[in-house]
């Protein structure tokens, strides 16, 4: 075997092993139970975040509150091309009464998500709820909100209602749960967990680098 053939074999083997490692890291089926524990924790944190506005809800989020809708439109107007990014259901609350209705409905959505009721749907709705509060009053945001919204986003991708949820209980009592069903290991659980892990590493890296500035 010539040196050229040895080099070719080395690079082919390296390529194959790298590809297998990459696929195993991202797509190897895994148990969704860790995601379900995360759903409970993130759901409770989201509810705590939402309930923290109860006392000053109207003053903070009303159409004529501290940050009126006109002020927010002016701020968003500076990025008109990306205006859709700042979507908020709270913009529809033109009166204090409607604002409280939106607030209560938002809390109910987060409660359903935490309990694992129609999790695939309520996970997406919960993300929209939290983003609505962030976009409506951006001056109140801190380091907590980006992490919370990141976790909600990635929980939408995986089967976070496979365990510890009303969905699981309903499936079991109705005889739907079986091998290969909601509770089985799947690649989407792996993707969701890996994205969370890498995003958290990115946060820690940026915080560490900021200390050097």
PLM features: what roles do these ranges have?
Residues 2-213:
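Alpha-helical membrane-anchoring segments
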């Amino acid at each position: 075997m010539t040196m050229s053939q040895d080099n070719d074999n080395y690079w082919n083997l390296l390529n194959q092993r790298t590809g297998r490692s990459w696929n195993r890291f991202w797509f190897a089926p895994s148990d969704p139970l860790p995601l379900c524990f995360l759903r409970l924790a993130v759901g409770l944190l989201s509810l705590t975040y939402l309930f923290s506005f109860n006392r000053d809800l109207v003053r903070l989020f009303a159409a004529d509150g501290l940050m009126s809708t006109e002020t927010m439109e002016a701020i968003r107007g500076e990025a008109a091309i990306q205006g859709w990014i700042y979507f908020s259901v709270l913009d529809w609350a033109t009166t204090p009464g409607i604002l409280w209705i939106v607030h209560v409905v938002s809390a109910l959505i987060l409660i359903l998500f935490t309990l694992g009721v129609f999790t695939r749907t309520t996970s997406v709705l919960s993300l929209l709820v939290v983003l609505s509060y962030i976009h409506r009053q951006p001056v109140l945001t801190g380091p907590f909100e980006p992490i919370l919204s990141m976790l909600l986003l990635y929980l939408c991708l995986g089967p976070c209602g496979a365990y510890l949820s009303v969905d699981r209980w309903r499936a079991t009592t109705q005889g739907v749960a079986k091998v290969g069903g909601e509770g089985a290991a799947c690649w989407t659980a792996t993707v969701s967990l890996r994205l969370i892990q890498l995003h958290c590493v990115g946060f820690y890296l940026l915080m560490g680098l900021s200390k050097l500035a």
